[in-house]
Amino acid sequence: MEEQFTNQKKVSHLQSLMNTKRSEQPTEFAKKHRFKDTLALFLVFLSFNHFTSLCLLVSFIVATKCKDFLANCFIILFLSKKPSRHIGEVAHIDISTSKVTNGSSNRKSNSRFFGNSKNSFVIPIPVLICEILFAMLLKIYGGDYFVKPIKNLAISIIASFLINDPSDCLSYATSCSVLYAVSTNTFQRVSHFFDIIQLFDMSLRGTGQSIKLFTVFRKYSQFFKKLFSLFLPMPFKMLGKHSDSMIYYLSFHILFFSFASSLLHPHRQTAENKPLKKGFNSTKPDVARVQGLQKMRISSSSSVSADSNTLEDQSPMIPNDPGGLSSSNQTIHPSQQNNSPVPLSSHSNILNPAASYPTDATSSFPYFTSMVKEYKSYQPSVISAEGSNSQAVTTTTSTTTSPTTFNFSGDNTSLSNEISLSDSSNGNSKKDSDFFSPSNDKYTNQLFELNVDFGNMFSSSKLSSDISVTSNLENFIRLLFRRKNQHLIAPLWSMVVTLKTTNFEKKYLQETSENSLTPTNSNTSYVSNQEKHDKDLDTINTHSVSSRISFTHAGKFKKSVFNNFEPSNTMALIAKTTSDDYNLLNLVSTNENIFNRNDNDYKVCIIDISTNSITFHIENLHDGELIVLVNGVIWSEVSCALILEHVGEEYVVVNGLVPSCSYDIQFINRLNHRDDYLVSDLIVRTCGNNNAIAGKFENLDFSFPSYYHRKFLSPLLTLKHSVLTTNANLSDERTKLKKTKKEFSKKLSLLRQEIDYFKGRISQNATHDEKSTLKVENLKVALQQSETAVNKLEMQLKTLTEKELELEEEYLKKKDLHLKNQLEFSKLEESLSKDLKNSEGRFQKVNQELVQLGSKLDKLNARNEKLQKEVDQNAEEIEKFSTQFLSKREKDRFRRKEYRIREANKFELTIKGLEQDINRLENENENIHSLIGNSY
């Protein structure tokens, strides 16, 4: 036995070494030939013409600056959904005001990782201006001494970035560019002496002659030129003239930012890419954490005593009391919507418990609506199942390694971290556990006691949660575009890998949809399955299905990326045991997209949880059969009750459960005896037998927390719990049986005594038999009479039923007439009500107009009175003015008359004087004429 055990150890050790060598071979091969690949790709990029090189530079800048945008595009293409929003928008977290020292780096990385992509391409204006000025100075004063090397170095950076890690990008790029420059210079100098054709002076760009290997690129460039000429506003010739300067500025931009990032953050890539050198192995903390999680994976727990476990309120880690509750430090918190965010560092505390520290009280609680009045918080620590339960049993029966993926996701966060684990072999498990002992295997679990006010249910705001089951895939796609992490492939090649994965999965789904036994995930495959299935399958034929799947289609099922159970080539997202009845079902997806949920989909509500049974309320279950699986086994102790008031609703009671135990309960609706639809998948814990409560919380088994241990809810664990409970019940029943045997022996002796007594009485009362026979004959006669009476009553009942039918017909006719009259009356009433409303509206309008006109009339009367008063005043003033004016006018006339008389007298006197002068002058004239005439 010892020799076999040692041989198994050697074989397992050799297999592990072979697997590690096989896994290291591609990485070592890639690292050996990285310089050759970069140099070859650099020469290929140098052969591009102006347009293709310009497109290459622009695409590289866009790809390096818009990483979040590219990741969101791939999420939309790969998952057919919108990308998840920032965690602060979902959980109402104020990242700027949070002061948790532990999670500051995580928050920064997450804000950079999930942040908005609007500011990712923005460059500060002063930096851009300085860059342009420096590039212009180099081009003007340096000329070709700086332009060509800058272009070559930028292209070499692109080639190196496509192949190498970000930390080694600049080293490979500079070495390739220097080697190219030295080789070209030496070749040019040697060619002058030996008259060798200068191959490097050939016009690899432009319209000259080119090498035949690169004619394909020219054809594609001409096609893209014609395509871009349709969209560019400027003519393509103008773009061709300035292409050299554009290529120079873009290459200088790439060179400037790459060297600036390497100088400003020198240890950003190297510190994370180099392995740790602490101890004899660099992976010791990771292996310790993995071993702690392996213990949780391979074991389960039954119960934890209430006396030895305590809990300190608002403390994430409790080293001494790992699983209980204390009723001393339980404070009641009033519900506040703005002061209760969830810290983003909770994931780091879960994944690395040794580095967890107590956070602020305000940042350790989730977001509640106004419907929650008060809440009490409890954070018990969780330890491994081996430390808390001595009856832990492994769930896997085979010794082969099988991967398991744990999805540690918080209540209000969309960050979900995956840790892939593998079972160790028979011999290496003990050695690994000895070498890598876990430092701290304790985790925390949040429990809340809520005081809910259902009066504010309709007025409360809806939580805008965008947490989906594809968070791990979104993280995987986003991580491919992050620059600071080291990857096996370069970040820009990750786009090609993602597209290849999607195409591979599409081909796999097309191949598997042709098989009728393959579980499908879309409506198209469901239709094809309906066409192929002509015969109904009444029950699940476990042997035939498993044999067909394992033998005939084994090659197809192992080709999928997400459904491969081999330990070397696995990427399984959910680990399932192969012995479950769940894997033998023909599951069909209800929707093409899991995010399109309708109101007509299945709904399951938990009504009651007791010690041995759980009651559910299921809606929208109209047709088919209901199959209930408990821990992967079809459960028989199930009772259903239809709700006649509501179609498609029923109550389901799952019995035969064990107290204080977690169960994975799945409801499946089978239609047409062949297609199975998953209604719901729940993990529920039954109540305990004892009523001991510490701080209004049950003494829960915290080594079995929520969804972390879904893998452990296997049929073997269910059988183990059922065996333990049946043994306990058997011991109780045996003690009860002994007691009942004693009681039955006493009762049997009493019954025998009573039988003897009654036998004596019967022998004494033999004379009473004749009297009883007479009574029987009389009763027979009475029975005949009653039968005749019953026949008569039946005839009367027939006549009455006929009359009743006639009356019902008349009643129905009258009811129809009454309904018609009611309809006519309702129509008339509606028309009259409409007319009345119209008339009332008109009447109100007329009244309003009348009121308006009355107010206008009052205003006009008041204005008329005012004007009349003004007219009277004006008339009196006019009369006074006229009298004054007439008196004044008369005085003026009298004065004028006197003045005229005076003037007339003056004029008369002057006229008389003038007449005298005229007469005198005439006389003198005559005298002169007479004198003159006498002289001649």
From Swiss-Prot:
Residues 299-308, 394-405, 414-428 have a biased composition (Low complexity). Residues 1-41, 142-245 are lumenal. Keywords: Endoplasmic reticulum, Isopeptide bond, Membrane, Transmembrane, Transmembrane helix, Ubl conjugation. It comes from the Eukaryota. It is a multi-pass membrane protein. The chain crosses the membrane at residues 42-62, 121-141, 246-266. Present with 996 molecules/cell in log phase SD medium. This is Protein NNF2. It comes from Saccharomyces cerevisiae (strain ATCC 204508 / S288c) (Baker's yeast).
